[in-house]
């Protein structure tokens, strides 16, 4: 399981500016696998404690959503030994090559960039505005697994619970539950 979180701290809030200045004085080198910083470790421990489930947990803090997505896919592929990924129409997953491949929209993200990474499959996102019901979206996945994609090759399904780029579409809870099953 992987989560990609963003926090809006506002524009130039004095407390945020002070915290950034303080940390800039403390850093010697920053990257996720060299983290000798008390604040990083404390936050990671708090996130691990807040994550439900009785299993070992690890937290990695990264700079961008695209970086989080890339790492989530790498982790899923390494853990499962599979390489396929299902994404959804209207999705936005970043401007890196893998992020663009996962994004469910050609223009302006993929147009003119040539071949995308293989084994990325797009399925319809349930969206009444686009005439796609939950049942139709699930039916498409079933047909996909029966005719085009071996489900045993799928490492991950990546979905935004709320699509921003796709038009602020909320994934129906029952659809998310059905995907999990």
What are these regions (language model features)?
Residues 92-162, 170:
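PLP-dependent aminotransferase-class I/II
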Residues 3-83:
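Glycine-rich loop-to-alpha-helix module at the N-terminal edge of alpha/beta enzyme cores
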């Amino acid at each position: 399981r992987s989560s990609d979180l963003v926090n809006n701290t506002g524009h130039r809030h004095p407390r945020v500016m002070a915290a950034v200045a303080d940390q800039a004085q403390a850093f010697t080198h920053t990257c996720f696998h060299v983290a000798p910083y008390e604040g990083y470790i404390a936050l990671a421990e708090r996130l691990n404690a807040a994550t439900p489930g009785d299993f070992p947990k690890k937290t990695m803090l990264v700079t961008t959503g695209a970086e989080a997505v890339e790492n989530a896919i790498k982790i899923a592929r390494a853990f499962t030994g599979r390489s396929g990924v299902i994404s959804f129409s209207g999705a936005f997953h970043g401007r890196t090559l893998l992020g663009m491949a996962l994004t469910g929209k050609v223009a302006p993200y993929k147009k003119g960039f040539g071949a995308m990474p293989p084994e990325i499959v797009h399925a319809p996102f349930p969206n009444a505005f686009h005439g796609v019901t939950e049942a139709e979206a699930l039916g498409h996945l079933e047909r996909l697994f029966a005719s085009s994609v071996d489900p045993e090759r799928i490492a991950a399904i990546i979905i935004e619970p709320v699509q921003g780029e796709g038009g602020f579409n909320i994934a129906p809870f029952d659809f998310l539950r059905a995907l999990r099953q």
